[in-house]
């Protein structure tokens, strides 16, 4: 229930903002065969339901987004939903050529911590700051963790994962007939946990039918197969960073 309360609280905050016109608010809901984040499955390679809302005023934006997950429960935690809250500012440096985006993003996992979870991980709630530059169709984005990254902690050396970072290079290419091709490569550096660092890649194709957006993507990583497996509660040896195809359907309104 707390996860739903967080989402409703975020919705209430956005709706309470002054002078909000319908054009300032955007909503989205979707279903995907897997929730992949930075190449790693958050749902043990199983389907996910997702939804979010965004408010924009000039260059300022705020948003909330949520998805079903499995990885926390698999590690004996108690969170079935991830709730993301974010805000930032977008601006133009060179008209129609170069733009920027800076902001902060907090990932929340309500009720995640249990005694068994806390024996192996720290609090999974994570806050990152990010900055991005977009030149033509290409975007370079860097995210930097101000907290432990998703609960990762090196208990052997008593070192946290604060200062971990993610570098994301992607492009949004109109290939005609209303189709959009999105190639991506990323690098996740996890501080003080050597076998947690990896590179991921994806290639996605989507088409917008008046807000209804089906998509298909090939996703993969070079992540350590011994590190990125479900926790003990899942009783599974599935590699969560394996190469795979993900299909989805999203509705923007």
Q: Which positions does each model-derived feature cover?
A:
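Transmembrane beta-strands of outer-membrane beta-barrel proteins
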Residues: 25-31, 51, 60-64, 85, ...
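Cleavable N-terminal export/targeting peptides
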Residues: 1-24
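Residues that define the transmembrane beta-barrel architecture of outer-membrane proteins
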Residues: 45-49, 79-83, 98, 123-129, ...
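Outer-membrane beta-barrel "beta-signal"
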Residues: 203, 207-212, 218, 237-253
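Transmembrane beta-strands of outer-membrane beta-barrel pores
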Residues: 31-37, 57-59, 66-70, 91, ...
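Detector for outer-membrane/organellar transmembrane beta-barrel domains
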Residues: 120-191, 220
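Short loop/turn motifs that connect adjacent beta-strands in outer-membrane beta-barrel proteins
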Residues: 20-24, 92-99, 174-181, 210-211
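Surface-exposed loop and membrane-interface regions of Gram-negative outer-membrane beta-barrel proteins
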Residues: 61-95, 100-123
């Amino acid at each position: 229930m707390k996860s739903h309360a967080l989402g409703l609280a975020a919705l209430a905050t956005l709706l309470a903002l002054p002078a909000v016109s319908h054009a300032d608010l955007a909503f989205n809901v979707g279903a995907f065969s897997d929730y992949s984040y930075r190449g790693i499955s958050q749902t043990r390679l199983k389907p996910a339901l997702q939804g979010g809302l965004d408010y924009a005023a000039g260059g300022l934006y705020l948003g909330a987004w949520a998805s079903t997950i499995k990885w926390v429960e698999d590690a004996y935690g108690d969170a079935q939903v991830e709730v993301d809250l974010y805000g930032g500012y977008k601006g133009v440096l060179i008209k129609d050529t170069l733009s920027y985006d800076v902001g902060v993003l907090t990932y929340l996992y309500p009720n995640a911590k249990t005694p068994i979870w806390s024996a192996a991980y720290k609090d999974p709630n994570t806050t990152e700051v990010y900055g991005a530059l977009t030149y033509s169709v290409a975007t370079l984005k860097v995210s930097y963790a101000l907290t432990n990254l998703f609960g990762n902690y090196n208990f052997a050396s008593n070192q946290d994962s604060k200062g971990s970072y993610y570098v994301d290079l992607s492009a949004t290419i109109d290939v005609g007939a209303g189709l959009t091709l999105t190639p991506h490569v990323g690098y996740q550096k996890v501080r003080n946990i050597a076998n947690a660092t990896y590179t991921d890649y994806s290639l996605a194709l989507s088409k917008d039918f008046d807000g209804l957006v089906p998509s298909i993507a090939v996703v993969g990583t070079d992540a350590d197969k011994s590190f990125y497996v479900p926790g003990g509660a899942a009783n599974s040896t599935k590699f969560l960073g394996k190469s795979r195809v993900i299909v989805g359907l999203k509705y923007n309104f």
